[in-house]
Amino acid sequence: MSELKNRHDFVLLFDVQDGNPNGDPDAGNLPRIDPETGDGLVTDVSLKRKVRNFILLTQEKKPGFDIFVKEKAVLNSTIAQAYKDLGVDLNEKPKSDKDGKKRNTKGEAQGSEVDQGRAWMCKTFFDVRTFGAVMSTGANAGQVRGPVQLTFARSVTPIVSLEHSITRMAVATEAEAEKQGGDNRTMGRKNTVPYGLYRAHGFVSPHLAQQTGFSSGDLDLLFKAFLNMFELDRSAARGLMSMRKVIVFKHGSELGNAPAHALFDRVQVTPVNGEKPARSFKDYTVKVDTAKLPQGIEVMELAG
């Protein structure tokens, strides 16, 4: 895969209909919301989780496309496995005197061993070389600053969170059944957003990509993941979520040809009717100002 040599900045536009895009565990799993503005929020962690799930499903068992942070993973065990595969015994003194005459802490890498472990992790795990990771626990593979960074997603206009009462025609225990006299019903609640269009921003650094081994092929796969991640992550709780657009600004250099905020300002998302609550993507217009683009900037609009 070819080396990434161009900076990229991008905008993600996705929506939710009758679902909870990202519950807040500190607020009874209600949809995340900015209490001052009423804007809906989706964390960067939530978006990266969906990318990881997409890669796991579509790149299963392909070398170099495993996922480090996955469900039920024991991260320290994975880090220790790196050194086993590298043939580095962390209970013996380092092979090179440059790394120390003795092992400072048994079971923990030191000196250039950490660099070897970090390189192995980047080569093996897509999410490590993409988003970075803190791997300084356990056997210690250091830290990786990811070339791809995401912001929180924020709804274009304020959202409304609705609470619905639901009924299950069953109970969990015999005691509950006896208490209800055989009626066997369980009441519950479900929180949804009727409709929300969310906007997130992302950044790709070629300098950091060269350090982690994140390639142009990895970038293509990442954009494919953004476009399709909701298709493979359906649940009743999340309702209908769709990636509507991925708008990419490709720079003609590693350092970039324009500030990211100036490029993002060119993407204008406005309600068609500001007085009527939006209930579909058609209730918004999306315009990308491509007039008088800074020299070296190329705009690509990917649609889901």
Specify the residue positions occupied by each region the protein language model found.
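RNA-binding basic/glycine-rich loop and surface signature characteristic of RAMP-family CRISPR effectors
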Residues: 1-304
